[in-house]
Amino acid sequence: MAEAEGVPTTPGPASGSTFRGRRDVSGSWERDQQVEAAQRALVEVLGPYEPLLSRVQAALVWERPARSALWCLGLNAAFWFFALTSLRLVFLLAFGLMIIVCIDQWKNKIWPEIKVPRPDALDNESWGFVHPRLLSVPELCHHVAEVWVSGTIFIRNVLLFKKQNPGKFCLLSCGILTFLAVLGRYVPGLLLSYLMLVTVMMWPLAVYHRLWDRAYVRLKPALQRLDFSVRGYMMSKQRERQLRRRALHPERAMDNHSDSEEELAAFCPQLDDSTVARELAITDSEHSDAEVSCTDNGTFNLSRGQTPLTEGSEDLDGHSDPEESFARDLPDFPSINMDPAGLDDEDDTSIGMPSLMYRSPPGAEEPQAPPASRDEAALPELLLGALPVGSNLTSNLASLVSQGMIQLALSGASQPGPSGAPAQRATRGFLRSPSSDLDTDAEGDDFELLDQSELSQLDPASSRSH
């Protein structure tokens, strides 16, 4: 609506950032176009001189040390000749340009007309000079074009800066020119020219062989030691200042020292030497005072140097034989062998729960009572007999009651009728001792206690068999 009425609108921050991004993209695209144009122009000019440029690069990077040394000596001789000669500069410049023009005419105009062409010249026209580590003409022209475009952009920015800020440009240019004037006043121009020549000659060599990286790797330990030495020097200076302040103000230093000692004493409690020696003298088989007090309070204690996970470490160390250690730990595993009294019950759902200890004394006769009433009457005695001595009644009562009820229910469900012998076998099967769970195949001489009625039933069968 505002645009339709002709009211100018100010762009927001989002639109401003978008505009700057578009301007940066357009500027980079224009720069790439300029670089490509300059590269094409340089390739057209330097294309015929590719072998010569390759030889110059090989000489600058010292691929062939003999030729490179000759080139270096020739350049040094030419430089010092022009520097120390009594001839005029204009004469030398004109004479040098005349020699260059003659060589160019001979190589490009006269020699191609009088030389005999080779038979494979047409085949070699499509091939170019390739070196694995030297720059080809297109690559060299690309780098030169980037430098040229960067220089032109810099000059353009300087001219724009001069137009927008003439005062700042005047101060900046005067400062730079003053520095160059002082440098030229104290350093001869001949030496500066020679340094520039040596830099141009040695720079490709340093880049080609990565001398800067190698020098940094060699100097890195020394620089690190220098850094540490500087830090140590600063720390020593700080300590000297502190000592000087303490010497000038001893009362303040004593107050600070006492305060620091009190603070450290608060964090470091004092220990009695006799108590420490007595605690250190306690062996693994003895008990300390703290352990005895814990025992008096009714809680369990652990000997020094033992934990619930490492309480049996001495026993494990004593049994190095794997078979012996396996046989020793075998009673801890539940047995898979069923009691002979419980073989007739196929649905044994005890699921490996610890069975209750119940053994009738030898010679005692069991009263002929119904199985259910006899089991119910024996339940309290079983629970009290199976209760471990010295254990906590409250913690074990729930588990014992639940186990007894499950066993009674299973024994009641497994008996089919009023017959007493199968019910007694089932009850004894479910109320067997833990020692019966440890029977193996080798221990096949198991026995069970039978009533007098059972013995009378078995006697006629044995007499008939005999």
From Swiss-Prot:
Chain intervals for the UniProt region annotation (Disordered): 1-28, 284-374, 412-466
Comp. bias regions, Polar residues: 294-310, 453-466
Induction cue: Induced by amino acid starvation but not by endoplasmic reticulum stress.
TM helices/strands, residue ranges: 81-101, 164-184, 187-207, 382-402
Record motif LIR motif, residues: 445-450
Modified residue annotations for N-acetylalanine: A2
Composition bias, Basic and acidic residues: 316-331
Residues found modified as Phosphothreonine: T10, T283, T307, T310, T440
GO biological process: collagen catabolic process; endoplasmic reticulum tubular network organization; positive regulation of neuron projection development; reticulophagy
Residue positions, PTM Phosphoserine: S26, S258, S260, S285, S288, S293, S303, S313, S320, S360
Cellular compartment(s): Endoplasmic reticulum membrane
MF annotations from Gene Ontology: endoplasmic reticulum-autophagosome adaptor activity
UniProt function note: Endoplasmic reticulum (ER)-anchored autophagy regulator which exists in an inactive state under basal conditions but is activated following cellular stress. When activated, induces ER fragmentation and mediates ER delivery into lysosomes through sequestration into autophagosomes via interaction with ATG8 family proteins. Promotes ER membrane curvature and ER tubulation required for subsequent ER fragmentation and engulfment into autophagosomes. Required for collagen quality control in a LIR motif-dependent manner. Mediates NRF1-enhanced neurite outgrowth.
Subunit structure: Interacts with ATG8 family modifier proteins MAP1LC3A, MAP1LC3B, MAP1LC3C, GABARAP, GABARAPL1 and GABARAPL2. Interacts with CANX. Interacts with RTN4 isoform B.
Record's protein name: Reticulophagy regulator 3
